[in-house]
């Protein structure tokens, strides 16, 4: 592609973006909200548009910034093309800046979240999470902590695709010395999680309940909910059930949990038969 753009003489004035999907297909990563799930590779090239190259910039950016960037560079607004209001910000402020470090003051954090990734829970419900990353801290709020974060055990933890890694991790549930690996990947979680990404980039130690992080937990919770309210997120406005009521897109898999437990043969090709627990597990933490 780059060779073609160069052949046509437009490479230097073309914004080229290379990024990826969210999360590797491993337990506690794919479909989750931890740093390895949401911290994606991103490379952008635009020789004529990115001023002062060689700078090291620490601003947080998000996928939701792409659309406003493309619209601004094209000279049009979301209203002109019939789009809903955009929560992201154009990256042009970074492209045009001369600053290193924090180039744009409002980019000192990023909001993340998840709802339903796959079927496998009662009523096709998801596992709603909202989070904020700021100052190398990751704060997560789990709105339904009584639900299984990777899908129900009796339907195969369907939010995590089958793999040798998943198989070996599931085996640790019955090992007193290794059970913590199962807990981290598939066990129930509390309503709040906080991780110090400098010391714990793999998000293994939840410090939300530690006295040393009490102030940071409160500050991030307040900022997260304030911004979600400004965005009219139904989860913080008392209407979160609307996400659970959306029908699953696939007719073949809609109502998966109830149909599976009735004995119906369903094509759950993304998990292994051995992923399925023979009986529901107790809901304890």
Residue ranges, per PLM feature:
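Substrate-binding rim/cap in mid-to-C-terminal beta-strand-loop elements of soluble/periplasmic
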Residues: 2-7, 28-108, 187, 205
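Short acidic capping loops at alpha-helix termini that bridge into adjacent secondary structure
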Residues: 12-14
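Active-site metal-binding loops of divalent metal-dependent hydrolases
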Residues: 22
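Short catalytic/ligand-binding loop motif for oxyanion handling, primarily in non-cytosolic enzymes
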Residues: 25-28, 34, 119-120, 140-141, ...
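Long, internal low-complexity/basic segments
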Residues: 39, 175-192, 197-203, 207-285
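C-terminal cap/loop subdomain of S1 sulfatases and analogous C-terminal strand-loop tails that border
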Residues: 76-193
């Amino acid at each position: 592609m780059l060779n073609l753009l160069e052949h046509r003489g437009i490479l230097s004035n073309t914004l080229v973006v290379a990024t990826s999907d969210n999360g590797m297909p491993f337990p506690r990563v794919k479909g989750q909200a931890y740093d390895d799930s949401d911290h994606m590779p991103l490379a952008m090239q635009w020789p004529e548009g990115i001023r002062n190259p060689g700078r090291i910039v620490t601003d947080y950016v998000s996928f939701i910034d792409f659309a406003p960037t493309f619209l601004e560079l094209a000279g049009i607004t979301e209203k002109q093309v019939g789009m809903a209001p955009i929560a992201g910000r154009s990256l042009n402020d970074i492209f045009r800046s001369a600053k290193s470090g924090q180039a744009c003051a409002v980019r000192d954090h990023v909001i993340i979240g998840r709802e339903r990734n796959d079927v496998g829970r009662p009523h096709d419900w998801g596992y709603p999470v909202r989070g904020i990353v700021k100052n190398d801290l990751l704060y997560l709020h789990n709105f339904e902590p009584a639900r299984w974060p990777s899908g129900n055990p009796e339907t195969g933890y369907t939010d995590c695709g089958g793999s040798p890694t998943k198989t070996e991790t599931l085996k640790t549930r019955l090992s007193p010395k290794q059970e913590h690996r199962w807990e981290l990947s598939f066990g129930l979680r509390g309503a709040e999680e906080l991780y110090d990404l400098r010391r714990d980039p793999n998000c293994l130690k939840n410090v939300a309940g530690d006295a040393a992080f009490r102030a940071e937990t409160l500050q991030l919770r307040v900022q997260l909910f304030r911004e979600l309210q400004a965005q009219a997120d139904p989860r913080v406005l008392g209407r979160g059930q609307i996400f659970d009521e959306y029908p699953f897109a696939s007719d073949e898999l809609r109502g998966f949990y109830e149909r599976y437990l009735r004995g119906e043969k369903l094509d759950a090709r993304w998990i292994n038969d051995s992923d399925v627990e023979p009986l529901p597990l107790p809901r304890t933490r």
